[in-house]
Amino acid sequence: MEVIRYPNSPFKLHQPFPPAGDQPTAIAGLLEGLSDGLAYQTLLGVTGSGKTYTMANVIAQSGRPAIIMAHNKTLAAQLYAEMREFFPENAVEYFVSYYDYYQPEAYVPSRDLFIEKDSAINEHIEQMRLSATKNLMTRDDVIIVATVSAIYGIGDPTEYQQMVLSVKEGDTIEQRDIIATLVSMQYERGDLDFKRGSFRVRGDVIDVYPAESSENALRISLFDDEIDRLDMFDPLSGSLHQRVGRYTVFPSSHYVTPRDTVLRACESIKEELRERIEFFAREQRPVEQQRIEQRTRFDLEMLYEMGFCKGIENYSRHFSGKKEGEPPPTLMDYLPDNAIMFIDESHVTVTQIGGMYKGDASRKQNLVDYGFRLPSARDNRPLKFHEFEKVMPQTVFVSATPAKYEEEHAGQVVEQVVRPTGLVDPQIIIRPVATQVDDLMSEINDRIQKGERVLVTTLTKRMAEQLTDYYSELGIKVRYLHSDIDTVERVEIIRDLRLGLFDVLVGINLLREGLDIPEVSLVAILDADKEGFLRSHRSLIQTIGRAARNVNGVAILYADKITDSMKAAVDETERRREKQIKFNEEHGIVPQQIKKQVKDIIDGVYHEEDSGKGRRQGKNKVKVGEIHNEEDAIKEIAKLEKAMQQAARDLQFEEAAVLRDRIRNIKENLLFGAE
């Protein structure tokens, strides 16, 4: 693999092959648009044309920090993994919601039912979020892969940066001052339980486990009131990794604020509370008056004593000092001025960003109206779409089917229709609806004999269920993918399809963006002539594209009439086919079937870096169980960490070290943020 470093760029691109097909033209076009100052561009890239690789080349050549937005965690994880492969020496970060489970605070007036906020925070994703903001503030070579979590409020970047602890060998500082600063940054003192976001004191030595670090801790050795040396070490084994001259410890939460800001916020909250009490008194609503006073005074007491309280995010406007209705600080405020934004699958992601605010606002309004929260809680919210537009840096929309918004805003459209592999868009066949079920049956049998897979998309849940039952009774190995299936199980089903555990997958609207299944040679669209969201020309092109990764790809549209959407989808697919066929003929390319390994089962070996210290685990192969995506990995890591800590308490240090290496192994293989 060639490693390429462009002039004036901090990125090192690990290039498995040079750009080919339409990629060189697309890369040059996007770079020219960026240098010309175009605010918006569109990369119209067909399925399998290597859009992610094009993005990586644009980032590497421009030398600018980048944020890539995806519309769900699964796609974000896929992009994150690919970017880690292209930029293993740079800071590729993952910024998604850190909740494994989240029940927001809500009130149902009709039943007089108040639902307390309940959530389970995923520690590993929280660490990755903190790592993302730290690297945005300290490095130039940063690529953030994010979901819409990026438009939700987090702490103010200015306040966050003021709360850091910077230490340097030779500095004069008292031990008690270091401890006081760490406590103000919400680090816990844990002399017995040394974990992420904590510190311990042993004589003149302070060990700090930074909140954003996945596996390194900092040892501050003092001599009187002078910092004698700084070392990075393994928090489990205690083995030293390297000596550092200086280090910056960042706060353990995005919501940490200086003491004077907390006191200022408390005064502002008191003033708003007084106004709200007067309002409910005038309205003669004593229950709401007592409720808001009791709840807010309790929170104020916690803020005075501890510096934070449960639900502190509802007071974010008072902490940031913003006026009513002003946008909250978000990840977008942490981005440097020269950043680039890529919005992947923009025809879905842009719409999703636009819809986040309204759902949040209606829930908050009830809490305010009935005295559970102060009116300022409404400003703890995601960005409105027009606010998001104001903070968007130079943006590239990436989609095979750009929507109306992209078409209206694109300064230029760069096409990436030709695939380097030579694969041609699927041949489209239109057949009558009357015999669709039996006709499809014979097509399925043909594919099964060739060892290929089939995707079938229907219009309704009932139709999908009946079709699945019918084919199952006829001996076809068929599964049904529907909206009730969670992300983990969905990934498992797709993996099983690729492995050949079944041959046909039936779905409704789940067989579109982000499904990378080279084994699928037939996509069947039932009732293709029923105009609507599921049969719009964009939906049809996306669904047809699922067969574009197979050399024998065919799409059958069952319809009794040709609708405008069908005509647009067929014409666009034919245009792309002709362009690819012409390219193949000119360059003597014979389309080759993509042979993509099913990577979901990890069986790897962890090799500790050659540092002269520690031991090499190369000969001790560690087999990891079936891990399909980030959720599986996180569960496995949590289980292994519990076992590792128990082994350490039982003084079984060798066993603990093996478990530690398993955890690292999972992180490295799934590219989860091992540093």
Swiss-Prot record:
One Gene Ontology molecular-function label: DNA binding
Domain of life: Bacteria
InterPro entries to which the protein is assigned, alphabetical: Helicase/UvrB_N, Helicase_ATP-bd, Helicase_C-like, P-loop_NTPase, UVR_dom, UVR_dom_sf, UvrB, UvrB_inter
Domain called Helicase C-terminal: residue spans: 436-602
Gene Ontology CC entries for this record: cytoplasm; excinuclease repair complex
Pfam families in the cross-refs: Helicase_C, ResIII, UVR, UvrB, UvrB_inter
Gene3D superfamilies referenced in this protein's UniProt entry, alphabetically: 6.10.140.240, P-loop containing nucleotide triphosphate hydrolases (3.40.50.300), UVR domain (4.10.860.10)
Domain Helicase ATP-binding: 32-417
UniProt key word Nucleotide-binding: yes
Annotated motif Beta-hairpin, positions: 98-121
Protein name from the UniProt record: UvrABC system protein B
Organism of provenance: Neisseria gonorrhoeae
Protein encoded by which gene: uvrB
